[in-house]
């Protein structure tokens, strides 16, 4: 795998730098293995040089150079000159008690420098100008020491055979860089580390450092003398280190980079390390001129583990001491190492890419006196043990890792700490860093990525003093507040994954500080850990309605009086903990009414949410929380008054109110969800402030509950003005506990079932101060209901109480129920205080019951009942024992109404029902009024005596055949007035009604027996207050108490039941008069007829439902309807002068003489069921005189079927011999309702009069068709005859329901005509179009010519080609396509309906030359034809989809003659939709579609001969003549889609032979740009020689003789005119365009074509 380029650079650099070291190591290894002999050379001369002088000599006493890799033992007290170019020696060994000078006069590599033999002395090194000494520190093993040889190659053990360790520089003294530049390199063969560096002792000094360069290329070098700081340049390689642990330059400080010296970091990675060790009693501080590190290189460490120390910028703290303040100028790293009780102070700006703070033991202190900035992608790591870091200026720690150390960063007032801080606080038992702000300050992210947390799993962020600490981004840390004036300010989007004020500050305490928000924020942990200083003073939300504070903790605790503040624009608090109960122990302060949201929507039903503080303000100016969403939690509001604009309760959620005052403007909940609990915990009452709405009409709460009273006497709800309670159930936990107090005025609503659940009743209800309270549901109370100070209790459901009373007599009970309800009260031992009034305002009935036996006093009392608002038709049932004349008071009962009596259904009244007591209604007693009639009723078998002259009431009974009414209110000349007796036919009847005086009863009489005393006249039925109070009569009226001389008069519109009876106590006495329209029951009987029955109205009618026996019956000019099956008229004389409508019934004249006036007519009805007809019977002993009648009409309502033949007869008058007069023409005419029947009247042999009925359908239908658009259709007359003679078809029977001639003609006409001729002609036209396309193709081929045809055989054809042109159709074969569109219109001709046909199609062909004179080809055609039929077939549509196959060819003869022809075979799929009609039972006509789908086959051919004549240059005339034959055949099919008019269609073939004569004229070639254009015009005459269209036969189901289709009436001769142009660009491609017109009598067609051909 290829290495990265920077890796290669490192590899090359390391190889070059360590080449000499590798040589030494390799030589030593080789010596040890016998590959070479290592020398040990000793000095013995004055001048000692490694080239041989001054060293031990050979056997011949000759000097010999010191071999490479040899060890040098200094025995003589003489200096040594290392003058071997690129010399390399294993080491120097001092075996002389003197300091020896070593001169490096050539570049030299040296291993160890040892003074073990004379440790008081050193080698002092001097480097010549430009020379480099490389020290590798390579040691020597004991094996190697024992095997070294001298110059004589004799073993001379080095160091007595003892080893010298690697990196032993104990013999190193001064290093003198001389008067010119030279270099010292530490390139350790066995590199040291920072933990175990190569330490240069105090005797290792630098002389002339200003001329020196010190390179550390391998290993860590620690120096002990300040002189090393004087080296002009110290260069530290990647991964290597240089460490200062020295005496001081001045005082206790070491000056670095003074006088132009520099410390540099070589290499590409910048990982070289400079370590500054504060030394006790020596250099504790480091004064730096300029800055250390840079260009992202160099790691600088300040180590004060031993003693407090400082890193000081000589230019002042406002200057960089580490790196520079731009990205490229930063040091690679900065490390600060401290220990417990020790401090490191950096008095200058720090710019490093990576920073490490480490403490050997906990509580080491690091002080940054100015900016610390690790840059955009820099890092800070806390290691080893916890340390304390104090910054003084804005600082950037970058990505900071606290690990699991309890480290602390302190930030002074107004400063910003930037970074992304990570710890390991999630690891149990670990801590992970604290950031402490002294006062104001900001903690900011160092990352541009908002998803990177600012703090992650650190221990805490602390605000320890007065001031605002600004936070943004995401934090996983605890927030701690150490002063009452401490504030955390959270920017928009801040997330705190941790708690607030749970743990004391580092070195401090918790205090009730505050949190403020600039936008949305999240705090996931608890806030405050109980009372005292750990609780928060306040949380202030952002002043923005769109911002949210999300709280995930279970405890939000504030100090006493602490608040969550919603500013003017609100904001949202969202509670999200779903695992624990939640306590919010603080007030919610609202700045602006109806703003702010508390969102606990995510809470579950397993959680309890407690708000232990006030919410908003209830007062003169309410300030409500905009919305509180409790989710599904159990929420308790128990810490003070609560003002909420909208309380949102999730499914199964509940809210508990305590002893405070609550304003809930509205609740939002799903219907039947949510629960409110009143549970006062300090006293026994809860107060709902004015304007509170719990639940709503659309979405009631599931339950409102009154909690257990506990040790208290009751649980009381004080209800303010305008408070409304909506719940499915309003319950009480304890039986007989829970009282409502409504005393604030205004209106209140209580909706839902109140009490009764599990048998638990509520206690009491109290109304006062003019309050109106509406209970919309059932309510059950054990105690009393009291109403005072003009208050009103509105009841809409069942209501149970001990009693209902008004101490001051001003209380009102108002029933507003829409359905029936029961009010249940207890009987009382003493009287209760009377109500001012009972009002009925709803349409539902009210039953007031009383139970118990405590006494005989009623549970509610009043002297006034009022019907108001929507109570029309309502009924109030009073408790048993309360009469109309006495309600327990000194004055009679007043019954008032303001609701009138008009309804959409007619007259109606509100009613009061009494039972168990008789009543007397006195004259003057207020009951109803003229415009507001009321109803009085009996609920038991008691009586009512009416003494009022005018009673604005109707009277009824609840139980059938119970109750008596005596009407005695009339006075002489002034009849009494009552508004009805009974509620209508079918309702309960009174047992007895008695009229003792004259009366106008402006309503019904519904009584088993009604007696009109002798001499009394009663008029019944009529009009009251603009509406009909009732006109029904059911039961029996007895005229007279003894003598029968009473009179009854029925007002207009009386409706008598068929079982009703009017009888007289004495025969031939008593009169019955009808003043208007009437339905008449039975009057008198054959033994005791009444004196007279007269009908005195004008232009009225009477429906006779019973028999009439009267001395005189005078119908006046009434029209009579016989509405019972057999009505008998018996009496001495009967007068009729109007219409007698018999329907299907029998009218019998039983006796006496009946006279018919000149307006008399008869109507009768013929029924289909039994063939009966209404008729008249003149019994023996009776006679009818009709001698004075004028022309009288007999009309038959014919409901029988007209599907019959011949003539039917029906008896109209039986006993005709007793009919005196002429019945028949000219005095009588007979008409009937069935237009297909002729009616007549004849007299039978027995003199009875008989109606005749003759079928006339054929004539009627024929006439209907003749006068319709179908009348001119050829052959339609015969088809109509065929249709009407097929009387057994469903279509024929359906026709007989037609109401008029137009419907009849349309129904029949669409069946007996068809479109087969049009469809066949259209299909043949399409086949001819395809043949024409083939003919045009053949003509174009001959005209354009080919080389094969040029010559004598081609005749005149080439003459049409312009001079110089070549024939272009010079290929053997080609393929072509011709799309075309045809629009044809055939007008109505010869009576045959026209059509419009539009055809789109394409013909695709392939042709070739069979030989020089014969061309043949084949083609397929695809077509679609849409036919819309016209005239009397308008609305019919046909679609034809065709596919054809054709063969075509042309033969060239001699002398310019030719023949051409084609054969075609096509298959067509036809979809035909024809209109039909259908009549329902009432003769209403609807349109239906008969669909016919079938296949058609068409085939044929044509042959044409012609002659080409060259009329002139460029013009070719071709006369032509020929024949064409086509044959078409349809398959048989059955229509679908109609109810009665589907036809079976059978077809035969159609064919035609046409003679074709015409000519074509071809013009010369026209060259247009690169195209050759060949024009052509033609004209042909096509004449039909022979052929016929199929006579299609069609039958309906059940029809035997078929209908025949209309013959073809289209023109035989047509004319074709056309023109075309062929266009060629080359021999391969040909294009064309053409137009043709077809013209015939009443027919035109236009066709357009395109052409494309590809020649091969």
Swiss-Prot record:
Annotated GO CC locations: cell outer membrane; cell surface; extracellular region; periplasmic space
Domain annotation Autotransporter: ranges: 1368-1656
Prosegment location in residue numbers: 1339-1363
Keyword flag Acetylation: no
Keywords assigned by UniProt, alphabetized: Cell outer membrane, Membrane, Periplasm, Secreted, Transmembrane, Transmembrane beta strand, Virulence
Pfam families: Autotransporter, rOmpB_passenger
Sequence similarity: Belongs to the rickettsiae OmpA/OmpB family.
Function: The 120 kDa surface-exposed protein is a major structural protein which may play a role as a rickettsial virulence factor and/or immunogen during infection. The 32 kDa beta peptide may serve as a membrane anchor.
Protein name: Outer membrane protein B
